[in-house]
């Protein structure tokens, strides 16, 4: 399981919308190269045009980080940005090492909210069920409260 969930706080949801235009492609197209004509095989069916536009507005979630000494930092984090990266942008220093979800240096424990940490492989399902997460590969999916500096709690 890759999604960790704590008691949920209400959060707005927004879906991504994709707009694209299709064009029919001919069965074959003649290309000339150095005076010679050659056929370029083309698969039949719809094609995405060069005007393909993907638009998805990131949803902002409030993230509260609680340090080992009780210090709290609160900031907004987009749902498409890692919590570690959003914290750094907000001026909050957190421990990290790999930035790839393959160690436990940035471990935290969530007491409220929901994150997506599907890119990680370090934590097992039991640890995630207990609310543990890795801030370097966790995207906020709802407002969150995360207790940081929890690496030693994992062992």
Swiss-Prot record:
The entry's keywords: 2Fe-2S, Chloroplast, Electron transport, Iron, Iron-sulfur, Metal-binding, Plastid, Transit peptide, Transport
InterPro entries: 2Fe-2S_ferredoxin-like_sf, 2Fe-2S_ferredoxin-type, 2Fe2S_fd_BS, Beta-grasp_dom_sf, Fd_pln
Transit peptide location on this chain: 1-58
Cofactor(s) annotated in UniProt: [2Fe-2S] cluster
Cross-referenced Pfam families: Fer2
PROSITE patterns per the UniProt record, alphabetical: 2FE2S_FER_1 (PS00197), 2FE2S_FER_2 (PS51085)
GO BP term (any one): electron transport chain
Binding site for [2Fe-2S] cluster: 98, 103, 106, 136
Domain 2Fe-2S ferredoxin-type stretches: 61-152
GO MF terms, alphabetically ordered: 2 iron, 2 sulfur cluster binding; electron transfer activity; metal ion binding
Inducers of expression: By nitrate.
CDD domains linked to this entry: fer2
Main location group: plastid
Gene3D superfamilies named in the record: 3.10.20.30
One Gene Ontology CC term in the entry: chloroplast
Protein's cellular compartments: Plastid, Chloroplast
Bound cofactor: record note: Binds 1 [2Fe-2S] cluster.
Family as reported in the entry's similarity comment: Belongs to the 2Fe2S plant-type ferredoxin family.
NCBIfam families hit by this protein: fdx_plant (TIGR02008)
PANTHER family the record matches: FERREDOXIN, FERREDOXIN-6, CHLOROPLASTIC
Reported function: Ferredoxins are iron-sulfur proteins that transfer electrons in a wide variety of metabolic reactions.
Annotated protein name in UniProt: Ferredoxin-6, chloroplastic
Species for this entry: Zea mays
